[in-house]
Amino acid sequence: MTYSGDFIRRTRNPITHQSLLNRRLAMPHFLGMALLIGVMTGSAYATDNQQPQQRKTIQKPTPAIHDVHNGDVPSPSVAPEYKLQTVSREGVEYIEKLRKGTPFGTTDFNLEGLRAGMGTRNEPHLEGVKLIRLKIGDIPCEWVLAPGADPDVRLLYLHGGGWVSGSGGNYLPLAVDISVAAKCAVLLPDYRLAPEHRFPAGLEDCIAAHEWMVANGPSGPCPAKATFIAGDSAGGNLTLATLLALRDRKRTLPAGGIAISAATDFTLASESLRTIHDPIISARTMPEFRDRYLDKTDPRNPLASPVFGDYRGIPPLLIQVGEHEMLRDDSVRVAKKAVSDGIPVKLEVWPGMVHVFHIRGLPESREAIEHIAEFMSACAYPARAHAPSIHSSAAVPQRFCRRTTWKVRRAPRCR
């Protein structure tokens, strides 16, 4: 199986402005919690009672997809000029609203307030969803199984929250969206948090949860057909670190990994930390998170800062990040490192988007989740389809439009 090694920024099929005005978009059913490094202050997360609706977008020209072999991935040393390059009206309005606010952590770091928001349970609003609470050893967890999902295709989702806050219950709506789109069971672990439990306590919980999930599903003991690990922000960091640790310990690896808006470098060397004004979170928070999580651990430890990892032997990766978030270059750099180690990587830098935009209830949010589902399907069922197709348009030179196949490992079906 081969992979082209391209870094990909997807574009969407154009529709007219008038047709967008004539369509009614789904309305949000609840407000989400303030999240930064997995949390967003003053933002809304939408989930629908129905299946995800058809995308309603306006095509705007975007730069070409970047080819890693030509060395023209988004330059970490160049901050994109702030222009509303989102392709949906909702995205434009949402980001304009964000720009009027104050990013989290601009004046102070309120850990208690952060935990209060991120610890709130957000019940999903889709009928027929199965929620199963359990413990893996001492780790509280919850299964999420949407109607029609395959319980033997399993995703371990690691929540964000800066390593110091957050809970699986706060991420139930996103877990439902992924379960619906990817037709998989989603396991949400409440891994241990800093500063009470510093590195590598939370990471060890993530490793243990995946090892358990390989042999156990929502209905009890049963080998998985395929497993995946995903996470956002701090959870994206833990996703990559868990993959590295599983490989190093010669444990069963998942079929693929998905890192969303991941923080990958505790040396804080990414240029975007200084050049991008993030409307969600202030760069001042990064030393606060680091010091509470790492304490005296070397910030160049690959299990703490995955950008310094050796990715040989790691399964395929899907990396998604917003163009206008301060952690953008963390994703770009780790993707380049993994590709240099010979690993299949798909990097999506979403024009105009912000930190963990998947939870915002935007058309881009739904499309990004669809991309996750496509990636998982390509890894779990290689005989059914090629890897996620790459749409071409006038804005994307044909030389960047290549197909991909992914290496997959299988497990026996339950009887």
Q: Where do the model's predicted regions map?
A:
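Catalytic histidine-centered segment of alpha/beta-hydrolase-like enzymes
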Residues: 353-363
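Gly/Ser-rich "nucleophile elbow"/oxyanion-hole loop immediately N-terminal to the catalytic nucleophile
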Residues: 214-228, 249
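Short amphipathic alpha-helix adjacent to the substrate-entry channel of hydrolases
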Residues: 169-187
